[in-house]
């Protein structure tokens, strides 16, 4: 696949190239208040040059689990500590992140990371969800405005240009585009973040935006499966119920039938209760919801074997009102997600302890963890310097 090769080449240009046999300990394990403990608790491991299928055999159980975590960081010290101490698979640049991390520290952290390349992710949709506005030329138009005022090709070009700016900063994953279908007012939870109320329009414009990001070497992540557009509220504030699955199939799920085939691409599963699918559980913690995405059976899509992300598991009341972070992370991995996402680092050691306990107890099958590690390794591509 050409995309991981492009990603690896760009990463090599952005960071210090580390030979595959290098296993040195990254410097600077100090942390700001509330971050991971300063004392390293993970043994430094060499960067791996193995093919994705061979990666699980090279990692300890704890390092496998760590690769399935993406956590928000406050600043460079916070990022350095969680990568050095716990070998997490990725970090999230969020609304509270000190953007001076891009002044050189991020490249050093990436160069001194764990066994696989470090994923660096962001919510950069344009419009009102723009974490990097001060670094990439402002917020840009909202998705709704783009669909109303630009052609599909113009949207692809815009996403490519913004993606290139993100990639120069070191971003490898963008949690965009929004694929939700809605005509709700602009200022509602999805609102103008959506390309519109017509599934065909959303498919065309979201597909163009995703392709522009791919053109730039950034992985697009479609969200919020199986569809937040007609949900009963805001999952940041509490539980959200969508229309029944049969209703979603003819509307909200339509874009996914096409867009999951346009690889490489990821999908984020939302905290949405879907009558006829998830029962009282949110989709992000539901085996039935992830199985719907994986198999395509039930909504007319082909199987999907790309990376599946949870939505934020710590800062959204739809989850945090019911579960602590460790339990939520376990449940999303049990449901079949590959990557658990949340917005702070302080929970990482407890999460890894809980996941290791679940492995030993048979609550989380090692075979499922290994499959997710292979997907994560495929998503990331080879380490810089591996010659692939």
Curated annotation (Swiss-Prot):
Catalytic activity, reaction form: Hydrolysis of terminal non-reducing N-acetyl-D-hexosamine residues in N-acetyl-beta-D-hexosaminides
SUPFAM superfamilies associated with the record: (Trans)glycosidases
Taxonomy, superkingdom: Bacteria
UniProt-annotated catalytic positions: 236 (proton donor/acceptor), 311 (nucleophile)
EC code: 3.2.1.52
Pathway the protein takes part in: Cell wall biogenesis; peptidoglycan recycling
Compartments, as annotated in UniProt: Cell inner membrane
Signal sequence interval, chain numbering: 1-19
Lipidation (S-diacylglycerol cysteine): 20
Bilayer-crossing regions: none
Keywords: Cell inner membrane, Cell membrane, Cell wall biogenesis/degradation, Glycosidase, Hydrolase, Lipoprotein, Membrane, Palmitate, Signal
One cellular component (GO) term of this entry: plasma membrane
Annotated membrane topology: Lipid-anchor
GO MF, one example: beta-N-acetylglucosaminidase activity
UniProt site (Important for catalytic activity): 234
Major site of localization recorded for this protein: membrane
Family annotation (PROSITE patterns): PROKAR_LIPOPROTEIN (PS51257)
Keyword Transmembrane included in the entry's annotation: no
Matching Pfam families: Glyco_hydro_3
Binding site for substrate: 123, 131, 193, 223-224
Record-stated family: Belongs to the glycosyl hydrolase 3 family.
Function: Plays a role in peptidoglycan recycling by cleaving the terminal beta-1,4-linked N-acetylglucosamine (GlcNAc) from peptidoglycan fragments. Acts as a regulator for GlcNAc-MurNAc levels by cleaving disaccharides and allowing the breakdown of MurNAc.
Protein name listed in UniProt: Beta-hexosaminidase LpqI
């Amino acid at each position: 696949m050409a995309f991981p090769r492009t990603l690896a080449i760009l990463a090599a240009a952005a960071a210090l190239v580390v030979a595959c046999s290098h296993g040195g300990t990254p410097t600077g394990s100090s942390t700001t208040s509330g971050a991971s403990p300063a004392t390293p608790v993970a043994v430094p491991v060499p960067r791996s040059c193995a093919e994705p299928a061979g990666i699980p055999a090279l990692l300890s159980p704890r390092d496998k689990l760590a690769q399935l975590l993406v956590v928000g960081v406050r600043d460079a010290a916070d990022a350095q500590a969680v990568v050095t101490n716990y070998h997490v698979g990725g970090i999230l640049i969020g609304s509270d992140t000190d953007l001076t991390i891009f002044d050189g520290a991020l490249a050093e952290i990436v160069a001194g990371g764990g066994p696989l390349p470090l994923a660096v992710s962001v919510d950069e949709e344009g419009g009102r969800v723009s974490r990097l506005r001060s670094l990439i030329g402002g917020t840009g138009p909202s998705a709704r405005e783009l669909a109303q005022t630009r052609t599909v090709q113009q949207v692809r070009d815009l996403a490519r240009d913004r993606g290139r700016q993100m990639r120069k900063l070191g971003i490898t994953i963008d949690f965009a585009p929004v694929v939700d279908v809605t005509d709700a007012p602009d200022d509602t939870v999805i609102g103008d973040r959506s390309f519109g109320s017509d599934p065909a329009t959303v498919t065309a414009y979201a597909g163009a935006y995703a392709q522009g990001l791919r053109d730039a070497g950034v992985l697009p992540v479609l969200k919020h499966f199986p569809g937040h557009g007609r949900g009963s509220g805001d999952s940041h504030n509490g539980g959200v119920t969508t229309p029944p699955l049969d209703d979603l199939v003819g509307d909200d799920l339509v874009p996914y039938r096409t867009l999951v085939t346009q690889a490489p691409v990821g999908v984020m599963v939302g905290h949405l209760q879907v009558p006829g699918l998830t029962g009282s559980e949110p989709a992000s913690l539901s085996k039935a919801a992830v199985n719907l995405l994986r198999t395509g059976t039930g909504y007319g899509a082909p199987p999907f074997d790309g990376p599946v992300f949870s939505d934020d598991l710590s800062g959204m009341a739809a989850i945090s009102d019911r579960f602590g972070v460790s339990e939520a992370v376990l449940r999303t991995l049990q449901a079949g997600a590959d990557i658990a996402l949340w917005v702070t680092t302080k929970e990482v050691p407890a999460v890894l302890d809980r996941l290791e306990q679940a492995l030993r107890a048979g609550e989380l099958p090692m075979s499922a963890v290994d499959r997710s590690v292979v997907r994560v390794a495929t998503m990331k591509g080879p380490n810089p310097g591996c010659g692939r």
